[in-house]
Design a protein with these regions (language model features):
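Single-residue recognition of alpha-helix boundary sites
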Residues: 13-14, 46
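Sec/Tat signal peptide C-region and signal peptidase I cleavage site
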Residues: 15-19
């Protein structure tokens, strides 16, 4: 359950998967369910602000579980990212999370090296006082758990076919990890008696097992196939069991 914060962040990040290239001041809200039980809520607020005299975009993700599910899992997460509105590249990221007994503070400072590589200077503070620090570089852009929306905005929806894959890199827990979004085709989804024709995407995490390449399912995303391109539902996979997150209409 400690990955719940990451999953909540990713599902909200891709909720602007097919948004316009302009950065709007707005707030998106979702409710999460375990079966019929309301498990929590999350919101992603986007604001255009000034930072050190420069125009930037600030995104704040807040995720909370309800008391009804806290014996199963609990989270109280606040994540903030600052991005460059011109290319959606992250500048700074911080995370303060309470997930069960785990209390974590993380921050990442992004920069560009002299040879054009993306550099991510990462720090993670544990509740017992331990500190982990690491700097990693990549030829491709590295995102944090919220600024990955910038990656999602760049996807061309005009050339989709079933099985098409979109790969990106994510800074999390002082590591750079690979994530993949796979287009699955179309489906009709019903939310509060309203039907949506949706494009379906599967988010997976590649890993190695006994020398063989495998993929771990994280969530399935249902995006309305209309001009709004709204994510109306996410099916979240755990090691045991699953949950659903539905848009608040």
């Amino acid at each position: 359950m400690k990955r719940m914060g990451l999953i909540m962040a990713l599902m909200l990040a891709v909720s602007e998967l097919f948004a316009a290239q302009t950065w709007k001041n707005e707030t998106l809200r979702y409710t999460m369910y375990l079966g019929p039980i309301k498990a929590g809520e999350a919101s992603l607020a986007t604001k255009n602000i000034k930072r050190n005299g420069q125009d930037v975009v600030r995104m704040d993700l807040i995720a909370r579980t309800t008391s009804a599910v806290e014996k199963i899992f609990s989270l109280n997460d606040t994540l903030t990212t600052i991005v460059n509105p011109k290319d959606a590249a992250p500048v700074y990221f911080q995370k303060h999370c309470f997930e069960g007994d785990d209390i974590v503070k993380e921050r990442v400072t992004f920069s560009t090296t002299s040879d054009g590589r993306c550099s991510a200077s990462m720090r993670k503070d544990y509740k017992d006082g331990r500190v982990k620090e690491k700097t990693a570089t990549s030829k491709s852009q590295v995102y944090d758990m919220v600024s990955v929306v910038g990656f999602a905005r760049a996807i061309n929806t005009g050339n989709l076919y079933k099985g098409k894959r979109f790969s990106f890199k994510l800074a999390d827990a002082c590591e750079i990890i690979d994530e993949v979004l796979i287009y699955q085709g179309k489906e009709v989804v019903k939310i509060n008696s309203k039907k949506f024709s949706c494009m379906v995407f599967r988010l997976v995490e590649p890993y190695q097992e006994k020398g063989k390449a495998k993929e771990r399912d994280i969530l399935t995303i249902y995006v309305s196939d209309d001009a709004q391109r709204t994510i109306v539902q996410m099916d979240i996979k755990f090691k045991v069991g699953s949950a659903k997150a539905k848009i608040i209409l």
